Amino acid sequence: MKYYISFAWRNIWRNKKRSILATSSIFFAVFLALIMRSLQFGQYEYMVNSTVSMYTGYLQLQAKGFWDNHSFDESFELTDTLYRKMKNHAGITTINPRIETAALISHATETRISPVIGIDPYSEDKMTGLKKRLSKGNYLTEESKGILIAEGLADRLNVDVGDSIVIFGQGYQGVIAAQVFQIEGIIKYPIPKMNNAFVYMTIKNAQELFNLSNRITSIPIMINNPSKLYELRNELSSKIDTNLVIMTWEEMSPEIVQAIAVDNASGFIMLLILYIVIGFGVFGTIVMMTLERT
C-alpha cells in the first residue's frame, strides 16, 4: 500500500506545472460553484423573507374561498378560542389579524381604487415593520379614528396629513360602506406598486365601516422554523374549523416559487457547463500522463 501511495505521489509531481494547473482548475471550479450557489440561495432566502414579512406571512388562515373571491361573504369570526389557539402555539411567533378589501378612495375631484387593510397596529408593525415606513404624521394606535395612506396614493389624490378622504365600498352581505376618514400618517414603500396603493385603518374601524361585527378576512402567521412549514400547517389544519383553511406562502405567491425554480435551474445548468469544461481539462491531463507511460 505504501508503495502505491509513494508511486502516485511521485507521479503527480513528475510534471509540477501540469499538476498545479489541474489542481488549480478543480479548486477554481469548486470555489466558483460554492460562491455562485451561496449567492443564489441567499437571494432566494431574501426573496422569501421579504414576501412573507411584508405581506403574506409564512402561513395564512382564511375562510374557504376567500383567496379566490376576496369577498366579505368568505370572512370568519375571530373567537377568543381561535385567537388563543394560534397565539399560544410554540411554533408561531406572530399572528396578525386583518381585514382586506378594495374600495374607492376619494378626495375632491380625485378618485382611486385602492386596497384597504384593517390591522392591529402592534401586530402589523411586529410582522411587517409598518411603523418604520412612516414618512409623515403619526402611526396608528388602537384608539385611532384615522388612517394611514401610501405616499404614491396620497400624491395622486393630492392629500397630506390632516386632510380627509372618503372611503366608499361594499360591506358584509352587500351593505353599502361609506365614511370620511382623516389622514393621520403617510407611509412610503420601496416598491412603486405598493407605494401607489394601500390604505390602513384599525380593525375596529374597518369592522364598523364594512359592517363586519367581530369578523375578519385573514390571519397571516409568522413561524420560528420555516423548515417545518408544512408540518405546522397540517397540525394547525387539524385543529381548526372545517370552514377555514391554512394556506402557505408558496400557494399565495406562486410567481415567487416559479422565479426561484427557473433561476435555480439556470444556475444548475451553468454549474453543469462549468464542470464539463473542467472535466475535459482534467481528462486531457490524465490522457497525457497515460501516453507518457506507453
Task: Name every feature range the model reports, one short phrase each.
Residues 90-93, 114, 181-185, 244, ...:
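Small-residue-enriched segments and motifs
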